[in-house]
Every structure is written in structure tokens, then in C-alpha cells.
């Protein structure tokens, strides 16, 4: 195995694992990293699909007990049935839009300038969402009115994934559609969208993880099938390296993020997005880095 190629696989695998579930856009980072490492040819595109599969398996492993409970309870447990319906409902909008506009989006928006712009806009949206969160609880409601107490200043009305209904799921699914633009971030769109629609930060994050499973798994299978003619046994070693590092880094990232959101907001990610986006635009405009359109 070529050492330089293996090192690229390690770097990209780690980039995928660390960015897939943070609100900073894995696709955007892979587009930029792929260009910097000169690994954005057809083989590189297939490689990205493989490492995404590694990342999603990390989520499946982390939530294996919950997934097993839902699957085993589909026949008789109402809570499991409602949860499965919510995931399906939230998945449909992005699938429909991807089937209709997917080719156009890849042809026109998969470039560093679009990614950088989406980084900045997404960062601003996160800051606005967190500003709204910070105002919650500062407006007091009349004592004795339970409904107003629960909803004062737009306080989260959903504190458990099991409390979601199909309308809530559909709203999150519609928010996920924005993630079709590279640089937006699927997790960022679903988490921030969920928070804006009344989910607590923890619930929005957890539901985003579950929602990633059918979305990324389905996209992986579909893209690998389309690229099957380009698959070669000679590439299995590189694919395996990237897959393993994506799985491990994603597993650690998911566990860390679940702890992080319990006591922190997403402002650090927002500022990172804005700063990173500005840097990419500046390097493009000054010619320091020759980003390809």
C-alpha cells in the first residue's frame, strides 16, 4: 500500500468522523480537504462514500440498544412504532429533493466557494438560534399558569425524543433539506431546526443522530451502486483504512457531543464556521490557495 495514499486515507477518515455529527458540515470539509490533498478524483468520491458508511456505523453501535428496542417493538409497542414513523417522516423531504435536484446540486454547488459561503451563513444562523435560546427563561410568566410557565419565552416543549409527534418530525425533516447545499451541515440543520421548532438542545441532537442512520445509509448504498463499475479490489486496502478511522473518530465524537450539549451551547461551532468560511474565501480571492470550482 502506498504510504502517502494511506496517510491521505487516515486524514480524510478522521475528518469525516469528526465532522459528520458536529454542526460544521462533513461534506464541506471533505470537499476542501480532498482538494488540498489532491484526492478528489472519481476514486476519491467513492472513498468519501465508504468513510461516511464507517461514520454512520459508529452511531448504530453507540445507540445499538435503543435501535434494538425499537426494532423489536415495532410489532406491538406504540412508542417504538411512533419513533419509527417519526424517523421515516423526517427522512422523506430530503430524499424527495435529492432525487429531483441532486444532480444539479452536485454539478453547480459542490465547490469551495459555495461551501465557504454556507459555512458563514450557517454560523450566523446558529448564533441567532443560540441567541433565541439564551432569551428563554428571561421573560417570566404569571405564576400558577402551568401552560405559560412551560412555554415562557418560547421554552422547549419537547424534552424527550419519545415526546416527538409526526408534525415535529416533519419540521425537522424540512430543515434537513437545507443540508443538501454543501457546507450547510446535516446535523447543524436538523439540530438547530429542531431547537427553533421547540425541541430541547439534547433532544434535537439525539434525534439528529437517529435521523442520520437512514439518510446516510441510504445515500451510501445508492451512491455505491451507481459507482459499482469503478470499484476495484486494488482499492480495498485504502477504503478499509479510511473506514476504520472514520468509525473510530465518529464514535468518540458522538460520545463527546452527547456530553457536551448537556452543559454547553453551539456558539463555538458557529464562530468556527464563520472564521473557517472567511479564511477559505480570503485564500481564494488572494490566490494563496487555488481552489477549483
From Swiss-Prot:
Looking up PANTHER family in the UniProt record yields: UNDECAPRENYL-DIPHOSPHATASE
Biological process per Gene Ontology, one example term: regulation of cell shape
The residue range of the signal peptide is: none
Membrane topology term: Multi-pass membrane protein
Q: What is the reaction catalyzed? A: di-trans,octa-cis-undecaprenyl diphosphate + H2O = di-trans,octa-cis-undecaprenyl phosphate + phosphate + H(+)
Described function: Catalyzes the dephosphorylation of undecaprenyl diphosphate (UPP). Confers resistance to bacitracin.
What other comment is given for this protein?
Bacitracin is thought to be involved in the inhibition of peptidoglycan synthesis by sequestering undecaprenyl diphosphate, thereby reducing the pool of lipid carrier available.
Question: InterPro entries from the entry?
Answer: UppP (IPR003824)
Compartment(s) where it occurs, according to its Swiss-Prot or TrEMBL record: Cell inner membrane
Q: Which GO terms describe its cellular component?
A: plasma membrane
Cite the NCBIfam families for this sequence: PRK00281.1-2
Q: Which GO terms describe its molecular function?
A: undecaprenyl-diphosphatase activity
To which species is this protein native?
Answer: Cupriavidus metallidurans (strain ATCC 43123 / DSM 2839 / NBRC 102507 / CH34)
EC numbers for this chain: 3.6.1.27
Q: Where does the UniProt entry say this protein principally localizes?
A: membrane
- Please give the family membership noted in the entry: Belongs to the UppP family.
Name assigned to this protein = Undecaprenyl-diphosphatase
Encoding gene (name): uppP
Q: What are the record keywords, sorted?
A: Antibiotic resistance, Cell inner membrane, Cell membrane, Cell shape, Cell wall biogenesis/degradation, Hydrolase, Membrane, Peptidoglycan synthesis, Transmembrane, Transmembrane helix
User: Record keywords: DNA repair included?
Assistant: no
Q: Which HAMAP family match?
A: Undec_diphosphatase
Transmembrane regions:
3-23, 43-63, 85-105, 109-129, 178-198, 203-223, 238-258, 269-289
